[in-house]
Amino acid sequence: MGRDIMVSLEEAVIARYTSHGEKFEILVDPYLAAKLKEGQNVDFDELLAIEVVFRDASKGEKAPEELLSKIFGTTDVKEIAKKIILKGQVQLTAKQREEIREQKKRQIITIISRNTINPQTDTPHPPHRIEKAMEELRINIDIYKSAEEQVPEIVKKLKKVLPIRFEKRDIAVKIPAEFASKAYNALYQFGAVKQEEWQPDGSLIVLIEIPSGIEAEFYAHLNKITKGNVQTKVVKKYSE
């Protein structure tokens, strides 16, 4: 949820850090602060409502530069802000927490749907089924951990109520010469190309590894690009 300009003072929340008996506060975009806490890169010009480190933001009391240098080893506000957010507390409202949690839940469901299958049917679980199972199990979403980091543990829990496993597939693809150049770039959007061979007639043969959950999407995209003139074959499956 990035912004083109810095967050306004009205929308900003306080991030607070205490060290050596001293309190330090900054005014930040709550959503970008959450992204930073989970390890993402953010634009500090958008993150900070004002480039000032306070002792007490509500009173407008600034922290002296000598104190900043003593505690943080620098007076660079952006460097200090990063430490305050990562080591301290961000004062989110209940609404902001719920918005971030919902956004993260959607990311987690998408990742699971794309990277796992139902081994009984050899097809992916639709997102709504995954969401229903998560609700049934009352799975907690950590707003300060990335979606990717939380997926493995959540899938373990889902196994209690769903037949589910992580799986990847190696797929051999042959594309006619007239569509090869256009399809070439599209292939890399779906997975890891392990081998590629350009044939004398200009056609392209590729071995690509993709998450099993996007196999149907992969075929549909190739068929659209090649107008149905594509050959595919699943060569190998990797399960976890």
From Swiss-Prot:
GO biological process assignments: cytosolic ribosome assembly
Record InterPro entries: EFG_III/V, Ribosome_mat_SBDS_CS, Ribosome_mat_SBDS_N_sf, Sdo1/SBDS, Sdo1/SBDS-like, SDO1/SBDS_C, SDO1/SBDS_central, Sdo1/SBDS_central_sf
A family per Pfam: SBDS_C
Family: Belongs to the SDO1/SBDS family.
Protein name per the record: Ribosome maturation protein SDO1 homolog
Lineage: Archaea, Methanobacteriati, Methanobacteriota, Methanomada group, Methanococci
